[in-house]
């Protein structure tokens, strides 16, 4: 396994270079799977770009996928039956129901529940808690450092109650799309699609902890993982000091991937 970074400024041709590399390798190794992972909104355009880069106009052993589409592909392959996935609209309905039941116990949220878009904001906060691994213990630890008379303390206390009710409702019924990547990470080792494949990640400015855990598993089974990184050529991508330095997100992404495990790092391009 190896990890390769393609570095460059915005508009420098990183994606074009990557797609050309993937196309050339796929023609030399038609027996191998090549997976290009991009943000959900870019999957269709990436498929078009790959087809345009291919001299035959087709991509038989190349797939352009998002993380979620990769999850469905792997689940279909390994025959893993998972609980139904609760989409964003479903989460809004569940959270509205739970908040309604808890209304008398809520101090801050109580007066805002009927405001347009407020439930959606609460849903977004809970989704980020899941993505970034903020469980109840971490939330409690953070709240202990706050004044118990502060607005933020009461608001987090309300969100914690709704979050707990949301988790209890989902248990043994549904999983969220944020949790799907953890399920996928556990299925990676059983997938023939992923074993010995070349996986490219393009168009990301950073990765959430759950995505990092998945990439860690992908590195174990794939032949190579290639990541495009937006950064100035004068910057050292392997030195991340603080979140306010230039290209901090890119440097944080690079250093977090390097730290995943004992990985051979291909020469930057």
Regions found by a protein language model. Give the residues of each.
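Glycine-rich P-loop/Walker A and Walker A-like loops and their local beta1-loop-alpha1 context
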Residues: 3-29, 33-46
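Histidine-anchored nucleotide/phosphate-binding helix
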Residues: 22-24, 208-222
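Acidic, Ser/Thr-rich peripheral helices and adjacent loops at domain boundaries
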Residues: 241-260
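Conserved helicase core region in the C-terminal RecA-like lobe
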Residues: 63-70, 198-207, 211, 226
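Conserved phosphoryl-transfer catalytic core
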Residues: 92, 105, 224-240
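Conserved P-loop NTPase-based nucleic-acid remodeling module centered on helicase motor cores
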Residues: 31-138, 147
């Amino acid at each position: 396994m190896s990890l390769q970074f393609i570095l460059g400024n915005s508009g420098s041709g990183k994606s074009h270079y990557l797609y050309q590399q993937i196309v050339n390798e796929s023609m030399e190794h038609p027996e191998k799977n090549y997976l290009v992972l991009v943000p959900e909104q870019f999957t269709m355009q990436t498929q078009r770009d790959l087809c345009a880069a291919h001299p035959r106009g087709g991509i038989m052993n190349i797939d352009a996928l998002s993380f979620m589409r990769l999850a469905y592909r792997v689940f279909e392959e390994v025959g893993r039956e998972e609980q139904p996935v609760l989409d964003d609209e479903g989460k809004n309905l569940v959270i509205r129901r739970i908040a309604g039941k808890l209304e008398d116990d809520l101090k801050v949220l109580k007066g805002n529940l009927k405001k347009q878009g407020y439930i959606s904001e609460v849903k977004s906060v809970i989704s980020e808690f899941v993505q970034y691994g903020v469980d109840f213990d971490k939330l409690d630890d953070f709240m202990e450092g706050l004044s118990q008379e502060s607005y933020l303390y009461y608001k987090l206390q309300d969100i914690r109650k709704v979050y707990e009710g949301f988790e209890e409702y989902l248990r043994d019924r549904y999983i969220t799309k944020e949790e799907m990547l953890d399920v996928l990470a556990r299925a990676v080792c059983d997938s023939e699609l992923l074993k010995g494949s070349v996986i490219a990640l393009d168009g990301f400015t950073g990765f959430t902890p759950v995505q990092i855990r998945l990439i860690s598993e992908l590195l174990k089974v794939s032949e190579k993982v290639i990541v495009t990184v937006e950064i100035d050529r004068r910057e050292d991508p392997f030195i991340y000091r603080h979140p306010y330095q230039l290209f901090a997100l890119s440097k944080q992404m690079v250093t977090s991937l390097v730290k995943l495990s004992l990985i051979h790092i291909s020469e930057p391009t």
